[in-house]
């Protein structure tokens, strides 16, 4: 359904009047950018160079980075989970857990160690929020990873909602290396291309830069007020 724009002409006429001129209704062209810093920044960096930028930025945002491989990911995840108090754990319902060989870790190995593991259920909205609220650890995959700011981008879908990323005490993000891009520009360009190709845009897109950081008027840093106390990134 196409939306309706109400009172547009009156609004634009008033702006033109305040500018002291007649309203322009034709011959208007989008101005050429004087600077392309949004595109030029880090554009010639290799994946390894972007990774170094990303890791350096993570030290500034109080985020631990674990470099791992497909073969070591299960072991590294289990170690970090146990070091951070175990469960309850809340996972996104994401096929990538199976693709990365993690299904048995969460279905068998961790439960044998008395670690409670739950998976986001698309049929239980309120139930999911309660699980997220009580979760010690939330785990999800990054859809885009921004080197410049140390940011992961996660898109809401039926298998994960916003609360999965913000309510658990500890947040673990699994980052496939191919998701690493220089900055927000490239991530948004790709999202836009997908929408133009017919994909439906996510109802909520979250840009997460480390754990929750807040500062009061005296610039005293407080961690965990609006989200997780700790964030750990696994680069695979």
Curated annotation (Swiss-Prot):
It holds the Pfam family LUD_dom. Coiled coil: none annotated. It comes from the Bacteria. GO terms for biological process: lactate metabolic process. InterPro entries: FTHF_cligase-like_sf, LUD_dom, LutC, NagB/RpiA_transferase-like. PANTHER family: LACTATE UTILIZATION PROTEIN C. Is involved in L-lactate degradation and allows cells to grow with lactate as the sole carbon source. Belongs to the LutC/YkgG family. This is Lactate utilization protein C. The gene is lutC.
